[in-house]
Structure formats: C-alpha cells, structure tokens
Amino acid sequence: MGCCQDKNRWASDEQARDEVTEDGREGNEVDNSGRRKQRSNESLLITVLWRRLSMFSRRESSRSGKQDNQMQERKHEGSHKEPEKG
C-alpha cells in the first residue's frame, strides 16, 4: 500500500519538474538551486532507505541461517537417537 503511494508521489513530482511555464523560464537560476536541493534531498532519502533495506535483509538472512542450523541439529540429533532405541 505505502509502496504504491510513494511511486505515485514520485511520478507526479517528475511530471511537475518536466512542465516548464513561461514564468519559470525567467527565474531559472532560482529554480535550478531549488531543483538541486530537491534532488539532493531525494538522493539522501534513497540512500537512507537503501541502507535500512540492506540492514533488514542482513538480519533476515542471519535469522534464516540460524533456523537452518537448528533444523540440521535436530535432524542430526534425531538420527543419533534412532540407533539407541534399536
């Protein structure tokens, strides 16, 4: 849900940037600095989100690795218990 909303917001921002009015042409210097700042903020946001996603992915992979190890240990313990019964 949030993912789609973000995509729509970014798409509308890009469309707004692409539309140039006659008044906007006169103040290009002001617009350029504003656009640079906005792009810088967007780049920073992307960087932060990417790092958070990477950290989350690492946590998940370490959790799944621990679960795999526990399952292997259980299987290993189970194979040792069977000969004792017999």
Swiss-Prot record:
<feature type="compositionally biased region" description="Basic and acidic residues">
    <location>
        <begin position="1"/>
        <end position="34"/>
    </location>
</feature>
<protein>
    <recommendedName>
        <fullName>Testis-expressed protein 54</fullName>
    </recommendedName>
</protein>
<feature type="region of interest" description="Disordered">
    <location>
        <begin position="1"/>
        <end position="43"/>
    </location>
</feature>
<feature type="region of interest" description="Disordered">
    <location>
        <begin position="57"/>
        <end position="86"/>
    </location>
</feature>
